[in-house]
Amino acid sequence: MKKLSFIIFISLIALAGCKKDPEPELPLQPLKSANCFIVSEAGRYSFETVKGEGNESVGEVVAAEVLWESFGTDKYPSAGSLIKSVSYKDGEIVFKATDKKGNAVIAAKDADGNILWSWHIWMTDQPQEQEYHNNAGIVM
């Protein structure tokens, strides 16, 4: 009986340690490419490594990296506060966003570590309520 209980116990531990399938990625550009993307909730997101507002390749990407994160206040986030992880695979950058609000920049890099292109990630829960006034008019 002790042996059976031990086997069941070990089996439960092994099952608990199994990795679940990764959270599916939400593509950020289903219709058009961009240089800035709005993320309104935590999750896994992806976008193609093309130059903003076009379909031209940014070059031979081998890695992706978060260059900086900001809450837009006088408080500085620690690394990973907004973007938990970022990677490059098969022409796409994939990242995991937290539920915090702010801004981040993700860069595509070549084999020498040179930045080929970067994208602004704007993390807000109210993108439809944002307005920016300038001499050219109002941007919403």
Question: Where are each of the predicted segments found?
Answer:
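Sec-dependent signal peptide recognition
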Residues: 2-9
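Solvent-exposed, low-complexity, repeat-rich "mucin-like" stalks and linkers
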Residues: 23-84, 131-140
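Extracellular structured ligand-interaction cores
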Residues: 92, 103-105, 116-118, 139
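A short beta-strand micro-motif common to beta-rich folds, especially ectodomain repeats
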Residues: 101-111
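C-terminal edge beta-strand
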Residues: 113-130
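Bacterial signal peptide processing site
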Residues: 19-21
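Extracellular/luminal low-complexity segments enriched in Ser/Thr/Pro
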Residues: 88-101
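C-terminal motif of bacterial Sec signal peptides marking the signal peptidase cleavage site
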Residues: 15-17
